[in-house]
């Protein structure tokens, strides 16, 4: 893992991002992924720095606020051989980017989305994020939160994500295994990571979560995997119901997994059989610094003199 580490970072001491970063680094290493084929994409926020803090030959893309998923989908569809991982905060993915978050579920592109869920906008001094519950007042808020919250698990499942899980930033070993399963899953995977923010959220602290989280896989009766089509509705309903548990006990682990749904790449390949062998990223677009497509004749007809 040492080869993936950088020598510096500028997160606050105790930030949950450290656990997510470590779990991600270990997952990439243990899966034996080709570093040249791993692309990290992030939005704006404290989580947006993840591509800077994992050393990869292809590095990553630090994109616009709320637009990480759209960049990631474009990268994956242009070159489906790449392993694309998105990191975004709860505000980035479920606030300004929530339209893209929902729309992505319809396509089921084969990539992984990691949502850093700390209940606040940490980079801009702790305003309430979309996952903070109505009436909760953190130390950074002058008054209790005036908005209701979004349930990331339920939203992802109802939007069409085919792998939906939750991890806890301070349980790195467990989170690492979830990330590995999400990456290996064929389809769109979302991991909601409970991430304490010691600087701005004094409610959902390490002590708060340590007493409450429990692992779904410790229940032998819990089976989130859809094995045949007729199981889908029942598994989805149970997963959404389970995601409503909050307070004294908060579940972490895999809520829902369904590999019976075709990926977007497979759907494209059905219409364009050469797609996977010759994706858009392999197209020659320039020669000796000049574009291979000449639009001069087209523009001549539209030139105004």
From Swiss-Prot:
Binding site for [4Fe-4S] cluster: 12, 15, 46, 197
Disulfide bond entries: none
Superkingdom of source: Archaea
Thermal effects: Optimum temperature is 70 degrees Celsius.
pH dependence comment: Optimum pH is between 7-8.
Keyword Magnesium: yes
Catalysed conversion reaction: a 2-oxocarboxylate + 2 oxidized [2Fe-2S]-[ferredoxin] + CoA = an acyl-CoA + 2 reduced [2Fe-2S]-[ferredoxin] + CO2 + H(+)
Entry's EC annotation: 1.2.7.11
Cofactor stoichiometry and binding remark: Binds 1 [4Fe-4S] cluster per subunit.
Class of this enzyme: oxidoreductase
One Gene Ontology term of the molecular function aspect: magnesium ion binding
The UniProt record lists the keyword Iron: yes
Residues flagged as site, Plays an important role in the binding of CoA: 125
A Pfam family this chain is assigned to: TPP_enzyme_C
Binding-site residues for Mg(2+), renumbered to this chain: 90, 118, 120
Binding, thiamine diphosphate: 44-47, 65, 91-92, 122-123
Cofactors required: [4Fe-4S] cluster; thiamine diphosphate; Mg(2+)
UniProt keyword list: Iron, Iron-sulfur, Magnesium, Metal-binding, Oxidoreductase, Thiamine pyrophosphate
Protein function: Catalyzes the coenzyme A-dependent oxidative decarboxylation of different 2-oxoacids such as 2-oxoglutarate, pyruvate and 2-oxobutyrate to form their CoA derivatives.
Subunit architecture: Heterodimer composed of an alpha and a beta subunit.
Matches recorded under NCBIfam families: Oxoac_fdxbeta_Archa (NF041171), PorB_KorB (TIGR02177)
Name this polypeptide is given: 2-oxoacid:ferredoxin oxidoreductase subunit beta
Organism encoding this protein: Saccharolobus solfataricus
